Regions:
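Secondary-structure transition/turn motif
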Residues: 76-79, 103-109, 143-145, 163-173
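Short, exposed beta-strand-loop hairpins at the edges of beta-sheets
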Residues: 142-163
C-alpha cells in the first residue's frame, strides 16, 4: 500500500510540474509570404488590406495623403532575444485605386534570408530605387512579369552596436 501511495504521489508531482513548465516559444514566422504580399498589392483596396494586416498583429498608425497617392502605415512591436523592435508595413495606393505598393521594414528578422528562397522563379534585374543608391545598402530586385519586388539590407549604426534594417517592396506592374 505504501508503494502504491508513493507511486500516486510521484505521478501527481510529475503532472503538476509539467503543467507549470513555461510555454515553448512559437517558431512560426509572423511575416507574410511573397504570395500574400502580391495578393495585397493586387487589392487596390485599403479596407481589404486593413483586415488582413491586422491578423498579423499590426495596428494602424497613420494615414499620409500626397498628390497622387495615399499611404497607410501600420506598426507592431515585437521582442526578439529580449530586444524590442518595431516592424512597419506601408500600403500605398494611387488616389484613383489603379495601383498599390506594399512596403515592409524591420530590424527584427532577416527578410533577405526569409524572402529570397521564395523568389527563385523570378528574374533579377537592375535596382532603381532610392535605397539601392546608398553605399550602406544592398538591394536585389526581382520581376516576374506581373510584380516588381525589391529586397534590401541596410547596414545601420545603433546605440547598442551595428545592425541591419531589412526592406521589401512589392508593386504590381
Amino acid at each position: 500500500m505504501k508503494s502504491f501511495r508513493l507511486t500516486i504521489s510521484l505521478l501527481f508531482i510529475t503532472i503538476f510540474a509539467h503543467a507549470q513548465a513555461p510555454a515553448t516559444i512559437a517558431t512560426k514566422n509572423p511575416f507574410p509570404t511573397i504570395s500574400t504580399l502580391s495578393n495585397w498589392a493586387s487589392y487596390n483596396s485599403q479596407e481589404k488590406f486593413n483586415i488582413d494586416v491586422r491578423s498579423l498583429g499590426f495596428k494602424f498608425e497613420e494615414k499620409s495623403v500626397e498628390a497622387a497617392s495615399t499611404a497607410y502605415t501600420y506598426i507592431r512591436k515585437v521582442t526578439v532575444d529580449n530586444i524590442n523592435y518595431t516592424d512597419r508595413i506601408v500600403y500605398r495606393i494611387a488616389n484613383d485605386n489603379s495601383a498599390s505598393i506594399i512596403s515592409l521594414v524591420t530590424a527584427s528578422t532577416d527578410l533577405v534570408s526569409f524572402f529570397t528562397p521564395q523568389l527563385t522563379g523570378y528574374k533579377t534585374g537592375k535596382c532603381d530605387n532610392e535605397m539601392s543608391k546608398d553605399k550602406k545598402t544592398t538591394c536585389t530586385c526581382y520581376d516576374n512579369g506581373k510584380f516588381v519586388i525589391d529586397v534590401c539590407d541596410e547596414r545601420v549604426k545603433l546605440t547598442m552596436g551595428d545592425g541591419n534594417n531589412y526592406f521589401i517592396s512589392v508593386a504590381k506592374k
